[in-house]
Each structure stands twice: as structure tokens, then as C-alpha cells.
Amino acid sequence: MLNSIAKKDIRTLGYVLRRVNYAEFDRILNLITPQGKIVAIAKGVRKEKSKLAGSIEMFSLTDFNIHFGRSEFGLITGAKMQRHYGNIVKDLSKMETAAMVLKKIDRASENSDNPEYFRILEQGLIGLDAGINLKIIEAWFLMNLKRTAGEEINLYRSTDGEKLAENMRYSWDVGENAFAKDERGEFGANEIKILRLMSTVDLKVVARVKADDEMVDKILRFVRIVG
């Protein structure tokens, strides 16, 4: 988290992960930026005529100016909204998925300055706003969150150490953290190809892959288990 690093002023793009009312008119904000997570205070933001209020919203990309002094929090001295993903707030299911994404990013980025957290959050919000299948968004997000945390899912070798074969069926062995050969297994070449794709390319590319509802459900169940 950036607050522990000595600095004075920065300008950065960011998303609000969490906001908590503080004192009479202020808010403490958890922000994710390309430089990592920042905790900053927005003074007077809850006042009716606050200049900051309209520029700091959930599900929005904002250009922040932040001053760092002796306080444990940064101080937001300026903010300008760059993009608001308005379609998210029009749909309860989208809002629930977005809230899950924000919560997980907030936790995962606590002790990291990895720019990937900003990237995968942004792609998730763009996908939600654009109407990409919610199950595909969740599966892609969980796969990439795990990868960003340094926990790769084994999608290339089975429990016996052999390369996964296109003509074989597999089931997931939780204990071995790998696919095991299983004639009745629910995972074949098509499912594994999509999982590999999810862990290596952008969400918008995955969204173009043709997959029926049954396959999407199967992939999401798998990612929830391993994630």
C-alpha cells in the first residue's frame, strides 16, 4: 500500500474500492491505482456543495490529486471523473458482481503495489458496463485475481505429471491441485482451452469465444472451487 512510502504529492488515475464516512463531512476512501492501493481522506465531500462530491463515485474512473503529509492518510486535493460505468447501477445483478470484485481487490491489494490489480478491476467494470455475461466476467476475474496473487492454477499437467491430452477427460483433484484422468470427468479439451485463455488474455477476447450455458456454468463452478 502506497501510504507507507515517503512522498509528497501525486496525480494518478484510480477507482474507489471502499468508502467510509468520517467525522461530520469527510470520507475515508480505499483507492486502487496503477501504482497500488492508497487510503486517502476526502475532506468535506459529504457537504451539499462540495466540489469533490460529483467527481468521486463508485464504479467510476477518476483522476486524483493526492497530498501526503504526516497523517496516515493521503489528502485528496483534487478529483476529476474520467468515466462513469453507469450501466452497472441500473442492474442489481451487475451491482452485486461489481461489489464482489471491489471487495476482493480491496483485500488482495492490501500489501501489494502490483499494477495488475488495477488492470483486472478496470476490465471487469468495463465488461459489466458493456453487458458481457456475468458468469464469464466472474470466472475471468477470479482466475486473474489468483494469478496476480502469484497462485497459478495448473492447466497443463495431470496428477501423474503428463501433459493434458486433447482426447482425454479429466476431473479436478483438490488434494493434488491438478486434473486427474477420469473417463467420466466433466473437463475435456474445450473446457481446458477456455480456462487457459481466461488466464492469459483480456476479458473482451474471452467474451468473444463461443461457449454454451452448460460449459460456462461448469467453468465458473471450477474457478470458484480453485479460487
Task: Outline where the language-model segments fall.
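Non-catalytic alpha-helical scaffolds and adjoining flexible linkers that form interface surfaces
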Residues: M1-I28, I32-G227
